[in-house]
């Protein structure tokens, strides 16, 4: 449940004419209720965190870690949700966690995009869902199969992410 920086030190990347040092932060996110593993036969699974000296419920640790990543460590958010085609959990089970993280990113003013993970990202119904989410959240939503992702897809995700930063200054040098 403790967020991890990937890689531990920033990697230099180039997207078109823009060069940046980036690190991604991998965190659990908000728990999807139909998921397994956050409870055991005794009730909520307890985990140790860097924030408390005693174990706390996994769901609470996941929420605290995600909030800290959003508020204290991130510059931009990449929200990953799904159409439900990637496993045994239907789309409807993801919506509450999806809305929670998007509301939090919006409230703190962090730029973000949404990846719609799908085993069939090019199908019309997947594209229609992406359009619906784009309309609802007012941010770019990219249908993608994360399992089949290529280097070019990552480039496109980073490029789309950069467009979410507000322009604060334009400088023109004229001879």
What is the meaning of each model-derived region?
Residues 100-113, 118-175:
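Canonical P-loop GTPase G-domain recognition
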